[in-house]
């Protein structure tokens, strides 16, 4: 009986930490934060029914063949930082003019970065990532994890691994303003 108790105790000690470990992204806190980031994007006029339409440009995977970038400083939960919203458009033979004339028809997803407080993820310049569907719901990866937070941190592919390669070291490809 004592050996059986020791085996059960050892098994519990090894497995309980696995279940209590936080997911690297897409956890409840990330989902709550993603909703706040989406609301800030609406309030900024970047997404939603009355969204600003800027001049789209030709893009590339994984975001889309036509992209639109909008950004400004916003405050979320007392943290002020850059909000970078990328609208990702797709469609067969899509052109910039197609998107200008009917952006809602071609919008496939919206990817957002928000620079969080110092220490949120210092190794990755404190960026929060979210990938949203056009209706504001979070997109999911093939494993069903919601794409919000430190998306794919430590993975060979995904938001963070790609953005580490951005020139200037600020995790933004279009410019180097957020060093």
What are these regions (language model features)?
Residues 7, 70-73, 128:
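A residue-level detector for conformationally permissive "hinge/kink" positions
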Residues 17-20:
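N-terminal signal peptide c-region/cleavage motif recognized by signal peptidases
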Residues 23-93:
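N-terminal secretory signal peptides
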Residues 24-29, 76, 80-179:
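Sequence context surrounding c-type heme c attachment/ligation sites in exported
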Residues 1-11:
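Bacterial N-terminal signal peptides that target proteins for export
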